[in-house]
Design a protein with these regions (language model features):
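Hydrophobic, well-ordered beta-alpha structural blocks that scaffold small-molecule cofactor pockets
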Residues: 1-45, 50-53
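Residue-level detector of alpha-helix initiation sites
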Residues: 22-24, 88, 134
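Hydrophobic beta-strand scaffold residues
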Residues: 39, 64, 103-104
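Short loop/edge segments at beta-strand edges and connector loops
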Residues: 43, 64-68, 108
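Glycine-rich, highly charged phosphate/nucleotide-binding loops
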Residues: 55-75
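ADP-ribose/adenylate-binding Rossmann-like module
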Residues: 79-85, 90-116
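E1/E1-like adenylate-forming module used to activate ubiquitin-like modifiers
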Residues: 106-156
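An accessory alpha-helical subdomain
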Residues: 134-218
Length: 218
């Protein structure tokens, strides 16, 4: 089995449904919270973590349906998470999700899922994901810790500076092919120069170079 990694964006008009109200459902809700998904939770009871999160903001994006799952609850859903301990409920959710052509994750049954959530590091708009089919969890955990040591405050500021540079380029030249040749060469040379500084002098020096380049942009 192979995987197809993607990042979902522009989700404002899409519905995500969580079946279940326990701690696993709470973690899944937290992972969806900062997306633009419309979120629906269906469960006869909710744990304190879910109650705290959904009452945190008046404009909460979450609709709560306080009853057990029923066939038909996944109509118009794009993404579905079943986080219950009832295998019969999970099986029925899986059947309906397949019929409705939803993305479906049964949290305790990978065989009845067509997606799962990787381990992630999130720093603003920078997301680093760790995922493997049948890989060693300890090795992935070690790799994650290595990345955590690399991605410090200076690296985040470097990333944000390069992001602003690209945003300004896109603003001035919405069509990538319209970038004048001299500007294109300047940008490509800067990219190569930045990586060279990063490798030879470290993150702080690269951040300084990126900020200086940003100041010179129109």
């Amino acid at each position: 089995m192979s995987i197809y990694p993607i990042s979902l964006v522009n989700l404002k008009n899409y519905l995500a449904v969580i079946i279940g109200g326990g701690h696993v459902a709470a973690r899944k809700l937290a992972s969806l919270w900062d997306t633009d998904f419309q979120i629906k939770i269906i469960s006869p009871s909710l744990c304190e973590d879910i109650l705290s999160l959904t009452t945190l903001k008046r404009d909460s994006p979450v609709q709560i349906i306080s009853r057990p799952y029923q066939v038909g609850d996944l109509r118009n859903a794009f993404l579905v998470i079943a986080a219950t301990n009832d295998s019969q409920v999970n099986e029925q959710v899986w059947i309906e999700a397949v019929q409705e052509k939803c993305l479906i994750n049964i949290t305790n049954n990978p065989a009845k899922s067509n997606f799962y959530n990787p381990s992630i590091l999130q720093y603003g708009s920078l997301t680093v994901a760790f995922s493997s089919i049948h890989g060693c969890p300890a090795l992935l955990s070690w790799l994650r810790k290595q990345c955590e040591t690399i991605i410090d405050d200076d690296f985040i500021e470097l990333f944000e500076a390069t992001q602003l540079i690209r945003i300004r380029l896109i603003h001035h030249y919405p069509n990538n092919y319209d970038i004048p040749e001299d500007n294109r060469i300047k940008w490509e040379n800067f990219n190569n120069h930045l990586i060279s500084i990063l490798e030879k002098e470290g993150v702080f020096a690269a951040k300084k170079a990126a900020l200086e380049f940003l100041k010179k942009m129109p």
